[in-house]
């Protein structure tokens, strides 16, 4: 039996963190919200991803939340619910004069 002697990370790169979070966002929240960057925090061993609301016709309107992923396990360790992100996105869109998300 082979024994794993080199630790493996579930989410080793920023690109993989962004891909995972965007898949969740687009499935649960909608296509207008996305993550474009992920920053690694070595103290918590988590990826931090700001969630932005953007429209092709208006560009990026702003950040509506943050997601935290544990790099070793791949688990979401902090995120607003899908319903909360939708509420925040609708509020920001309305404040910018855009109807609906």
Regions found by a protein language model. Give the residues of each.
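Long, terminal "pre-/pro-" and other extracytoplasmic accessory regions
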Residues: 1-101
């Amino acid at each position: 039996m082979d024994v794993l002697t080199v630790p493996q990370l579930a989410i080793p790169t920023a690109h993989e963190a962004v891909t995972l979070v965007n898949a969740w966002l687009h499935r649960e929240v909608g296509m207008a919200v996305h993550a474009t960057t992920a920053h690694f925090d070595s103290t918590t061993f988590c990826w931090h991803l700001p969630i932005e609301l953007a429209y092709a016709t208006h560009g990026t309107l702003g950040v509506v939340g943050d997601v935290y992923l544990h790099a070793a396990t791949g688990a979401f360790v902090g995120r607003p619910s899908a319903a909360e992100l939708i509420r925040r996105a609708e509020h920001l869109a309305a404040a910018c004069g855009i109807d609906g998300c």
